[in-house]
């Protein structure tokens, strides 16, 4: 039932789509004024980016909040690049899903794999990453499971460590897989424009 309700929300949204550089960009405008923008790989339909934007109390549009995809460093000028150089040793957290798993990558974590503990906190509905040396702690939610009103399961969680990057995977429940499949069918019905990025509302 929960899957259907989230799908209905997506179906009821006003959608525009743009195809560019091998990516399908979809912009959703919901009845409550919220906006969601997604980017998919045109060939594989793999989700590359998902971000949200809401209006503030005064009705002005806020900044896009990234849910899936690689964060773009703020500040494009020389000052921005200097700031990036200064902070490039800090852990960088990002989400990049696969077809069958939600996946998060935390870069710049040099400790061996046995130092990390990754677990589900049922009451808080989040995943917690800890290190036995107390050098790193991170708590994050899985918005997809919240939207579908599905429980978090420890058994769906796994992690690996390589090249100073901790890779955390959570196997997508069958309900989410089914909803994503239905959404792809729905998106094929949306009239898709071809053109420059400036044509798309989400840019």
Swiss-Prot record:
Under the heading InterPro entries, the entry gives: DPCD (IPR026224)
Q: Which GO terms describe its biological process?
A: determination of left/right symmetry; epithelial cilium movement involved in extracellular fluid movement; establishment of localization in cell; flagellated sperm motility; lateral ventricle development; left/right pattern formation; spermatogenesis; third ventricle development
Q: Name one GO cellular component term.
A: extracellular region
Q: Name one Pfam family in it.
A: DPCD
Q: What does this protein do?
A: May play a role in the formation or function of ciliated cells.
Question: Would you identify the family this protein belongs to, as annotated?
Answer: Belongs to the DPCD family.
**Alphabetical list of PANTHER family matching this protein:** PROTEIN DPCD
Record-given protein name: Protein DPCD
The uppermost taxa in this organism's lineage are: Eukaryota, Metazoa, Chordata, Craniata, Vertebrata
């Amino acid at each position: 039932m929960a899957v259907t309700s989230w799908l209905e929300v997506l179906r009821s949204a006003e959608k525009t789509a743009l195809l560019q550089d091998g990516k399908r960009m979809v912009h959703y405008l919901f009845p409550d004024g919220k906006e969601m923008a997604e980017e998919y790989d045109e060939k594989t339909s793999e989700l590359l980016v998902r971000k949200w934007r809401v209006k503030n109390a005064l009705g002005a549009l806020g900044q896009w909040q990234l849910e899936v995809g690689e964060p773009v460093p703020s500040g494009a000028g020389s000052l921005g690049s200097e700031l990036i150089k200064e902070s490039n040793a800090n852990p960088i957290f990002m989400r990049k899903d696969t077809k069958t798993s939600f996946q998060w990558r935390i870069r710049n974590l040099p400790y061996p794999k046995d130092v990390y503990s990754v677990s589900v906190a049922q009451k808080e509905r989040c995943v917690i990453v800890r290190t036995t040396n107390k050098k790193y702690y991170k708590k994050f939610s899985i918005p997809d499971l919240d939207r579908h009103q599905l429980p978090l399961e420890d058994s769906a969680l796994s992690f690996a460590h390589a090249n100073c990057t901790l890779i955390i995977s959570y196997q997508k429940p069958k309900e989410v897989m089914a909803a994503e499949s239905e959404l792809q069918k729905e998106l094929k019905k949306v009239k898709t424009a071809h053109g420059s990025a400036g044509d798309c509302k989400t840019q």
